[in-house]
Amino acid sequence: MDSTNPVFHGLREPHVNIIEKTDEEIRAAAEPLWRDLVKNSNEGKYGEFVKNFSGVMALAMNQVTAGHQFANSELARNLSEHFDYLGIIRRGEHVTVLYRQRSTKKDGEWLGRLVLGYEDGKIRIFGASIF
């Protein structure tokens, strides 16, 4: 061990890869994030919607795009608070958590996708969609 390595001096955290977490640990982290996305999408709260996004994702999801989505998508504003966990896919340094999502206004089911990984030592959202 090199004592000059900043990891051993607390200056930065050792590299963490989310795929090393168990399904239960990933699910425990993912479900509150998904619930917040559903709630904030329904309420059209852009600032709250993006608060757990990675830096790159937050930049890509600008306020104009999100505002248009919230204003013009009946689905995005009427997501059911009830969803079913379907599974986890691990790839590289990210996991994709899949959900069966329903609407309070439209019949049918949609596939919810939440991509998670670490950024600056915290679990962040790197992708989220419903299709």
Q: Each predicted region: which residue ranges?
A:
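Short, charge-rich amphipathic segments
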Residues: M1-F8, E43-V50, R77-S80, T104-W110
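Short, low-complexity N-terminal intrinsically disordered segments enriched in polar/charged residues
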Residues: M1-E43
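Short solvent-exposed beta->alpha transition segments
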Residues: P32, D36, G47-R90
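Surface-exposed, charged secondary-structure patches
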Residues: G67-Y118, G127-F131
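Extended aliphatic helical segments
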Residues: V7, V16, V38, V50, ...
